[in-house]
Amino acid sequence: MKIDYYEALGVTRTADDKTLKAAFRKLAMQYHPDRNPDDPEAERKFKEIGEAYETLKDPQKRAAYDRFGHAAFENGGMGGGFGNGFGGAGGFADIFEDIFGEMMGGGRRRSNGGRERGADLRYNMEVTLEEAYAGKTAQIRVPTSITCDECSGSGAKPGSQPTTCTMCSGSGRVRAAQGFFSVERTCPGCNGRGQIIKDPCEKCHGQGRVTQERSLSVNIPAGIEDGTRIRLAGEGEAGLRGGPAGDLYIFLSVKPHEFFQRDGADLYCKVPISMTTAALGGQFEVSTLDGTQTRVKVPEGTQNGKQFRLKGKGMPVLRQSVTGDLYIQIDIETPQNLSKRQRELLEEFEKLSWQENSPKSAGLFSRMKEFFEGIGE
């Protein structure tokens, strides 16, 4: 039984060219033999959708099919010029190259002489918070592949030249029959390079590149954060046989700081002060990342955990003229190892100031006392 071409592609009879192509592309990828090896049903479906699309994409064939159905192509219909077979070097393979380009192997692609882009490289670098604040220029040494200076990247021994592969005629691909259609594969004679090096360079063994450690200068901008990535174009691994170099990616991490914690552009720190300074008031100095000393006033009666904000004393925002703030949290130290006299004074202070100077704690203990006395009754 003949298939309905529209049903095979899952489209209506009014589908335009764009819809036909999209439907064919989706189904071709689904049933492609490379994705369904040894699956006769997938191969059958693959053949059907190819036959359907080959007919419907051509306006004249489609018009004939819409009018006469499959009879339009039987017994030499339409002058015998519109057969729906897929033999020869064109036909089915050409349809796929039109739709997918190089996905099917790029039969129309020509060899680039085996040149391949070099691999991208990664380099991990750790910087201090001070360096992240101010920025810096760092010198790094990266082990990588560079172009061989003996053969200038060709891979061939000086005085000789690579020869064109006779198996693929320099295309790097060969066409192989697979059932009712032909597909393209990487040429086994040259591994897809299109050229064969008979006399390889002794220094690079035909690769066109050698391994060597390089020294590079890296500019680290102010305001970088943990995980910031810097790309150095063309500083990666050298390309194969004269191909373009890859890129080098610097991945930055910021060391934990002894005093400051970071949250975006803002910095946080804790400053210990004495109990008397918190009660009577005073001041202290804090060193900031810009190298200055900033004096902070502590008002009398400052409570533990009180936070002070120093505007513009945080981290710069990467590539912006904006700076975060520094938040200082007060950490009141409780005195230890008191002398007899100190203890006496504190006990006297407690008796004099319990109600007047500590209303929160006095009120809490008063309510607790009343609560438990009520339970006892």
Swiss-Prot record:
Up-regulation conditions: By heat shock.
Record keyword Zinc-finger present: yes
Subcellular location: Cytoplasm
Binding-site residues, Zn(2+) 1: 148, 151, 201, 204
Gene Ontology terms: biological process: chaperone cofactor-dependent protein refolding; DNA replication; protein refolding; response to heat
Record keyword Zinc present: yes
MF (Gene Ontology): ATP binding; heat shock protein binding; unfolded protein binding; zinc ion binding
SUPFAM superfamilies tied to this protein: Chaperone J-domain, DnaJ/Hsp40 cysteine-rich domain, HSP40/DnaJ peptide-binding domain
Record key words, sorted: Chaperone, Cytoplasm, DNA replication, Metal-binding, Repeat, Stress response, Zinc, Zinc-finger
Quaternary structure and interacting proteins, as annotated: Homodimer.
NCBIfam families membership: DnaJ_bact (TIGR02349), PRK10767.1 (NF008035)
Similarity comment: family membership: Belongs to the DnaJ family.
Domain remark text: The J domain is necessary and sufficient to stimulate DnaK ATPase activity. Zinc center 1 plays an important role in the autonomous, DnaK-independent chaperone activity of DnaJ. Zinc center 2 is essential for interaction with DnaK and for DnaJ activity.
Name listed for the protein in its UniProt record: Chaperone protein DnaJ
Source organism of the structure: Brucella ovis (strain ATCC 25840 / 63/290 / NCTC 10512)
Gene: dnaJ
